[in-house]
Amino acid sequence: CQGTYRGDVTGSQKKYGFLMQAENPDCDTVELYEAPIDAMSGATLRQYTDIGKWRSVHYLALGGLNYLPIDYFLQQHPQVKNVVLCFDRDEPGLRFAETVAQRLAERGCNVEKRLPAVGKDYNESLIWYKSKIEKQRGERV
């Protein structure tokens, strides 16, 4: 049975995001996402689109539009200077990206904003991309 609960468990600490660490512990790049499903989708898209090895960067999901995990992560990973904002393509996500970009630039980080290519978020982009690949494979048969 799949549940539909989406929320925080009582007592959870918002400074801890969902982190998939890069293979190289000295990696200087992190991609920030709103939700774990989007971070996992971003990693999968990296594999599909041949951008590079999926573990070549850190992936951090913030658990919503929350700056605390960013601050905590950067404290724990002082070598990270390149931050890619992969937030949802909606008004709250776009506004948060502006705020985060400014704060990170003030910290001396290089910031890139990368909207999902298709759909509202990276999971929707992955679903679209996978259906495109499956359709192409079906046409070749």
Question: Where in this protein do the model-derived segments appear?
Answer:
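Helix N-cap/beta->alpha junction signal
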Residues: E34-I37, R89
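Basic, glycine-enriched DNA-binding surface that flanks or lies within the catalytic cores of DNA
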Residues: C1-E23
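TOPRIM fold recognition
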Residues: D28, T44-V141
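A short, charged/proline- and glycine-enriched loop
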Residues: N24-V30
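Conserved phosphate-coordination/catalytic loops
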Residues: T10, Y33, G64
